[in-house]
Curated annotation (Swiss-Prot):
Keywords, in A-Z order: Chloroplast, Fatty acid biosynthesis, Fatty acid metabolism, Iron, Lipid biosynthesis, Lipid metabolism, Metal-binding, Oxidoreductase, Plastid, Transit peptide
InterPro entries assigned: Fatty_acid_desaturase-2 (IPR005067), Ferritin-like_SF (IPR009078), RNR-like (IPR012348)
Similarity comment: Belongs to the fatty acid desaturase type 2 family.
Catalytic reaction list: hexadecanoyl-[ACP] + 2 reduced [2Fe-2S]-[ferredoxin] + O2 + 2 H(+) = (4Z)-hexadecenoyl-[ACP] + 2 oxidized [2Fe-2S]-[ferredoxin] + 2 H2O; octadecanoyl-[ACP] + 2 reduced [2Fe-2S]-[ferredoxin] + O2 + 2 H(+) = (9Z)-octadecenoyl-[ACP] + 2 oxidized [2Fe-2S]-[ferredoxin] + 2 H2O
Annotated protein name in UniProt: Palmitoyl-[acyl-carrier-protein] 4-desaturase 1, chloroplastic
Gene: SAD1
Length: 378
């Protein structure tokens, strides 16, 4: 599940030299325009038919059998097999390894873990995009349940391991999780299945990047066990991202026009990020502050987002789509193909702002309740 930078939760400007798409097609500021993002019953039925056939052999294969999956307990001290002294020694080893990890890395670790723990929200959302009940036996519903079951291990392992480090105010962390699940989410695509799948492509890819970078940072600061855990989570996310990406590639083949317009809608709409309603009972701008830290230390940056966008444009051969596009579909194609230039400029501006603040000697510090209100530079 994961995170985008706060600044990317707002609509993107039109690409330079290209026309903005009509707001009636892609804006999400009114009930009327949101309703226009629905797939017609005929197209919804066509999509369901595809998922009932193609997905059986091309999507479910990305899931691993439960017996071959790692489980959180594989990487945690086991009280049932250790004496009290041995258990105490094992916990002390965890805390000694974690001692050198700086506070800003802990903020990103917690933010990633909290986002993973809001899994009930994500499963509900993905099940609803095709009007499922949550218990259907069709391939899509089976995929969603299997995907969710694999994802569930991520939050479980990270939560337990971070607790054992002794570096965090776990009650504040737990409150944040409860607040986030209770807040729900609206990704701004009005249950359009194509938009929902594109959204999932970006989120799974972003999560892979983010956990991969926390693994790198944990290793750099000497906690090889935590680095391995983050790396395992990242590997799962990479596999899930590949599944959604392959599905979307097939959908572009089957219905290039609707898929293209869905892609443009997701990119231009004011899409709510999975953890954007994050709250700890104290900081109303917690997600923004968490995102600022993530950007600063390189866990997930505007540059990462730009590279990810270019990856999908290439992966889905967006610029080469010719047949099957309506005039509106072609405008959508022009729009998304021009976005990398916009994103590169955003990345450059973000980097320039950071350098100016550093050079001006105007550091900004934010307290995070997760780490006992310690101040972290952003």
């Amino acid at each position: 599940m994961e995170l985008h930078l706060a600044l990317l939760a707002s609509p993107l400007p039109a690409a330079p030299g290209r026309r903005s798409l009509p707001r009636s097609s892609f804006a999400t500021n009114s009930t009327t325009t949101i309703n226009q993002t629905h797939l017609s019953p005929e197209k919804q039925e066509k999509l369901q038919s595809l998922l009932d056939t193609w997905a059986e052999h091309n999507l479910l294969t990305f899931l691993k059998p439960v017996e071959k999956c790692w489980q959180p307990q594989d990487f945690l001290p086991d009280p049932s097999h250790l004496s009290p002294t041995e258990l105490g020694d094992a916990v002390r080893e965890i805390q000694e390894r974690a001692a050198e990890i700086p506070d800003d890395v802990w903020v990103c670790m917690v933010g990633n873990m909290v986002t993973e723990e809001a899994l009930p929200t994500y499963q509900s959302m993905m099940s609803l995009v095709l009007g499922g009940t949550g218990a259907d036996s069709n391939p899509w519903e089976r995929w969603i349940r299997g995907w969710s079951a694999e994802e569930n291990r991520h939050g479980d392992l990270l939560n337990k391991y971070l607790y054992l480090t002794g570096r965090l105010d776990m009650r504040q962390v737990e409150k944040t999780i409860q607040y986030l699940i209770g807040a729900g989410m609206d990704i701004g695509v009005d249950n359009n299945a194509l938009c929902g799948i594109i959204y999932a492509c970006f989120q799974e890819k972003a999560t892979f990047i983010s956990h991969g970078n926390t693994a790198r940072l944990a290793n750099h600061h000497g906690d090889t066990a935590l680095a391995k855990i983050c790396g395992l989570v990242a590997a799962d996310e990479k596999r899930h991202a590949a599944a959604y990406t392959n599905l979307m590639r097939k959908l572009f083949e089957v219905d290039p026009n609707e898929s293209m317009m869905a892609f443009a809608h997701v990119m231009q709409a004011r899409v709510t990020m999975p953890a954007s309603r994050m709250f700890d009972g104290r900081d109303p701008r917690l997600f923004t502050h968490f995102s600022d830290v993530s950007q600063k230390i390189g866990v997930y940056t505007v540059g990462d987002y730009s590279e990810m966008l270019e990856f999908f444009l290439k992966e889905w051969d967006i610029s080469d789509v010719v047949d099957g596009l309506s005039p509106e579909g072609r405008r959508a194609q022009e729009y998304v193909c021009g976005l990398p230039e916009v994103m590169r400029k955003l990345a450059e501006r973000a980097d320039d702002r950071r350098k100016k603040l550093v050079n001006a000697g105007e550091p900004r510090y934010i307290p995070f309740s997760w780490i006992f209100n310690k101040q972290v530079r952003v």
